[in-house]
Amino acid sequence: MASDTFPAALPAHLQVLRRHFIDLRDGRHGDNAVSREDKERLFAEAVSFLDLHARQALEEINQSLLLATGTVMATGVLRSADGGLTATWTLSWPEQLERRISPITLEAFFSSSFHHPHLRGATVGNWPLNIFSSDEAEAELPILRAIASADLHNLVFQSDYRIIPAIMINR
């Protein structure tokens, strides 16, 4: 990749974007995945690498803001309605359920029409999912935290601040 003139020491989040743009340019995903089958295999591996860190990001919110009243759940890799793949991690808690709003969600998805997979929240847009090792998954923890936190912020707008147990203490 002699034409890739990016600085050698990019921060992790910019390395992900760099890889994303190169994959789009070169028509591949990862090292050499071109076929949908190979890309889906890499997606399943990425979900496996990401699982611990997605749970951690949600559990941090559960422990600190939801006062450990929430439940983290994960689906594993599933076939989506459009024929692609999806895997979700959710954090539900009593106040959220009472108000019938979405849980905090981290979703890895690979739409059937996409070149490669992405991450998103229930209310937050897309981020490239270019994870091929446990170290790369760990480096995504700040992104997962940002998606989960932004999702919670947006859920407060859908309801109000009273869905956050830690805010209601000593009130």
What does each model-found stretch correspond to?
Residues 1-12, 16-19, 23, 86-143:
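Intrinsically disordered, low-complexity regulatory segments enriched in Ser/Thr/Pro
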Residues 1-53:
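Charge-rich, low-complexity N-terminal segments
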Residues 17, 21-24, 28, 57, ...:
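Short, flexible helical or helix-coil boundary motifs
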Residues 45-72:
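Amphipathic alpha-helical segments
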Residues 65-87:
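Long, charged, glycine-rich C-terminal linkers/tails
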Residues 142-149, 153:
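Well-ordered alpha/beta subsegment
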Residues 159-171:
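Extended, compositionally biased alpha-helical segments that mediate assembly or anchoring
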